[in-house]
Curated annotation (Swiss-Prot):
GO terms for biological process: proton motive force-driven mitochondrial ATP synthesis. NCBIfam families: atpD (TIGR01039). GO terms for molecular function: ATP binding; ATP hydrolysis activity; proton-transporting ATP synthase activity, rotational mechanism. Gene3D superfamilies: 2.40.10.170, Bovine Mitochondrial F1-atpase, Atp Synthase Beta Chain, Chain D, domain 3 (1.10.1140.10), P-loop containing nucleotide triphosphate hydrolases (3.40.50.300). GO terms for cellular component: chloroplast thylakoid membrane; mitochondrion; proton-transporting ATP synthase complex. The gene is atpB. This is ATP synthase subunit beta, chloroplastic. It is a peripheral membrane protein.
Length: 498
């Protein structure tokens, strides 16, 4: 964080040192600070507590002003641990909100909520910073055209397409391929759209954050040899951090993404894992500030806080921020205020299925549970819409027949249903796809499949033109031509064995 926007580096101007405040009360991560008359800081201003603890170690704790209490006192929330702070310590008003580094120098690096690098790779090589609190783009700046954000992933583009500048909820448990799907999206946006990504780890486990970083380095999303060629910036506020840091880390990631959109005019992917932790941290801070709790103990400002974050995630005439947010649903209760407030902002949902992952079908996106507001004929066109609906109908009918097949066997079905089951199994396998970021694990080259190719492939399966091909020919291939080539290879191999 730049302590004072009018000075270079992290220095504090002498003018500010003439009127420092003093800590008068500390309750956990909440501090009350008294300032001289007429020198009160504004709401959201960053304060810095400076001094030494009982063993002589220097203290430098950043806080954010949340309330003006009267009698020249303010209440602030600390962004790091408050151990060692004592009453009477000097507090400096920086005169501005928390500001974080932005631009290309952030790619390949890991930051905390204050924009300080935490990856031991030295300081960030940029003088450009931006405050984390800002207004959402004005309506006149918005790009109101509805356009599909092509990901190159067949199951997503066909059945639950993402909106450019939209918000997508990602639902999935542990071990179903959520991280790999996130990394593939980061890789594909860099290749197809020349875009970059920002990953905001909001209240996630430190181990998971470290695993993600290591996997990104392994798959090439973060380039260790030339860090400037990396495709993603990481911002972490883990579970063990104070609630103030977890509440604001999402805004830090969003601020970095906004710079790529507004100044570099790029398409940006913003990942937030987990949006529920943002709400949870806000609830903790609200209670610490003494606000009356609302439904189920959540903060009374839940909708306002969620709206102020989500409304900044949008398309403008310069570029777009498309956000993919992991959503934790407490006790699987979709009516809980936290997920219910999140759903109001989502354009699409991508649901990962443990059943599909168990079958080895990756990405394990559930084609029947995943939804999108973009799947309308007037937006995607009649051809795309009809193909998607027929694919869903075929898979739904197959799902209904599975109990009969399990009890009586496939032979008891009518000829028509047997044909439908065969096509559904081919569709299910054709929805799988080899990923670029999984090449190092699978040995199979990744595939980016354009939307037109995806639609053509599923139309050929539905029309019955490919009924003669074995279903394993459709497993983990790119477009439909690769499936027919794979079928020929399988036939040649079986002939050689004979």
């Amino acid at each position: 964080m730049r302590i004072n926007p009018t000075t270079s580096g992290s220095g504090v101007s002498t003018l500010e040192k003439k009127n420092p405040g003093r800590v008068v009360q500390i309750i956990g991560p909440v501090l009350d600070v008294a300032f001289p008359p007429g020198k009160m800081p504004n709401i959201y201003n960053a304060l810095v507590v400076q001094g030494r603890d009982s063993v002589g170690q220097p203290i430098n704790v950043a806080c954010e002003v949340q309330q003006l209490l009267g009698n020249n006192r303010v209440r602030a929330v600390a962004m790091s641990a408050t151990e060692g702070l004592t009453r009477g310590m000097e507090v400096i008003d920086t005169g501005a909100p928390i500001s974080v580094p932005v631009g290309g120098a952030t790619l390949g690096r890991i930051f905390n909520v204050l924009g300080e690098p935490v990856d031991n790779l030295g300081p960030v090589d940029t003088s450009t910073t931006s405050p984390i609190h800002r207004s959402a783009p004005a309506f006149i700046q918005l790009d109101t055209k509805l356009s599909i954000f092509e990901t190159g992933i067949k199951v997503v583009d066909l059945l639950a397409p993402y909106r450019r500048g939209g918000k997508i909820g990602l639902f999935g448990g542990a071990g179903v391929g959520k991280t790999v799907l996130i990394m593939e999206l980061i890789n594909n946006i860099a290749k197809a759209h020349g875009g970059v990504s920002v990953f905001g780890g909001v209240g996630e486990r430190t181990r998971e954050g470290n695993d993600l970083y290591m996997e990104m380095k392994e798959s090439g999303v973060i380039n260790e040899e030339n860090i400037a060629e990396s495709k993603v910036a990481l911002v972490y506020g883990q579970m063990n951090e104070p609630p103030g840091a977890r509440m604001r880390v999402g805004l830090t990631a969003l601020t970095m993404a906004e710079y790529f959109r507004d100044v570099n005019e790029q398409d940006v992917l913003l990942f937030i894992d987990n949006i529920f932790r943002f709400v949870q941290a806000g609830s903790e801070v609200s209670a610490l500030l003494g606000r009356m709790p609302s439904a189920v103990g959540y903060q009374p400002t839940l909708s306002t806080e969620m709206g102020s974050l989500q409304e900044r995630i949008t398309s403008t005439k310069e570029g777009s921020i498309t956000s993919i947010q992991a959503v934790y649903v407490p006790a699987d209760d979709l009516t809980d205020p936290a997920p219910a407030t999140t759903f109001a902002h989502l354009d699409a949902t991508t649901v990962l299925s443990r059943g599909l992952a168990a079958k080895g079908i990756y990405p394990a996106v559930d084609p029947l549970d995943s939804t999108s507001t973009m799947l309308q004929p007037r937006i995607v066109g009649e051809e795309h819409y009809e193909t998607a609906q027929r694919v869903k109908q075929t898979l739904q009918r197959y799902k209904e027949l599975q109990d009969i097949i399990a009890i009586l066997g496939l032979d008891e079905l009518s000829e028509e249903d047997r044909l439908l089951v065969a096509r559904a199994r081919k569709i299910e396998r054709f929805l799988s796809q080899p990923f670029f970021v999984a090449e190092v694990f699978t040995g199979s080259p990744g595939k980016y499949v354009g939307l037109a190719e995806t639609i053509r492939g599923f139309q050929l399966i539905l029309s019955g033109e490919l009924d003669g091909l074995p279903e394993q020919a459709f497993y983990l291939v790119g477009n439909i031509d690769e499936a027919t080539a794979k079928a020929m290879n399988l036939e040649m191999e079986s002939n050689l064995k004979k």
